[in-house]
Amino acid sequence: MTRDSPDSNDSYKHINKNTTQKTSFDRNSFDYIVRSGLAGGISGSCAKTLIAPLDRIKILFQTSNPHYTKYTGSLIGLVEAAKHIWINDGVRGFFQGHSATLLRIFPYAAVKFVAYEQIRNTLIPSKEFESHWRRLVSGSLAGLCSVFITYPLDLVRVRLAYETEHKRVKLGRIIKKIYKEPASATLIKNDYIPNWFCHWCNFYRGYVPTVLGMIPYAGVSFFAHDLLHDVLKSPFFAPYSVLELSEDDELERVQKKQRRPLRTWAELISGGLAGMASQTAAYPFEIIRRRLQVSALSPKTMYDHKFQSISEIAHIIFKERGVRGFFVGLSIGYIKVTPMVACSFFVYERMKWNFGI
């Protein structure tokens, strides 16, 4: 007994020391930011690749592409649109614009998750500061940060997906085309703004409704995900929904102040429901944004060189289809967003765990 006790104590101290060294970290450190950014970028890329075919069809519906307007409004139309793409372009047609999507989504998702972690850590430094509005604000601000940095790539992606006239659409040609399009008359009239900057602003067509839509979208997405995590970790669900950890993993989790990980099915459900809630809240703004992004290609604006405003686009949509016009493609949106957000949050949480953050 006397011989075993010191050994046991030494062993315990050794393990405890190693664990402390391994797990001590600063959430504001460069290492943490890089790891969380990498986890976010990978999760976003996985999610977007999963739903790329649905994303292509949704963009064609949202932008009222003349070749696809007859298919809108029903799930049967979705199948018919998919057949049309398959016959004309094959498998490649479903992934048209996907290279631009990946170029955009990796930095977008990386910035979004990093910003969320940092803003949340600032607004909610400890459990007593936890509140619904702080969660909502953290998500909204994270979304605004990411969309500002990556918006031009999103515009290019939409244009690539919108094109149906050419079998092979080149990224460089689309970028040149957007830059050479007529710039905003308001900017052109200002003598102090250089001409190149006016045309660069073409890459921010639809940016304002994007920002307006991002506030509810990102805010509701992160808020709903966190809220559902709380529900699924409640005493009623916890025995079925929370992943069982070994003693060492549990000790490490506590020291790092990590959330208890959910089982796969629970994580996917919380992510999917969060995505549906955020999609519903922000969808009208997304419709306006998509129409603004392709407004320069519309026959009605091709010759008068008019840079349309949000109110003008909203009026056109309402005149064409009424209130339903602001929710065109929402059923596809639900089909798309459920697996996308579920996959995104699931991969992010698992990547964080594997990266030791």
Curated annotation (Swiss-Prot):
Transmembrane parts of this sequence: 31-47, 103-119, 136-153, 208-228, 269-285, 325-347
Predominant place of localization: mitochondrion
PANTHER family xrefs: SOLUTE CARRIER FAMILY 25
InterPro entries reported for this sequence: GDC-like, Mit_carrier, Mitochondrial_sb/sol_carrier, Mt_carrier_dom_sf
The name this protein goes by in its record: Mitochondrial carrier protein LEU5
Keyword annotations of the record: Membrane, Mitochondrion, Mitochondrion inner membrane, Repeat, Transmembrane, Transmembrane helix, Transport
Each Solcar repeat, start to end: 31-122, 130-231, 262-354
Gene transcribed to yield this protein: LEU5
GO cellular component: mitochondrial inner membrane; mitochondrion
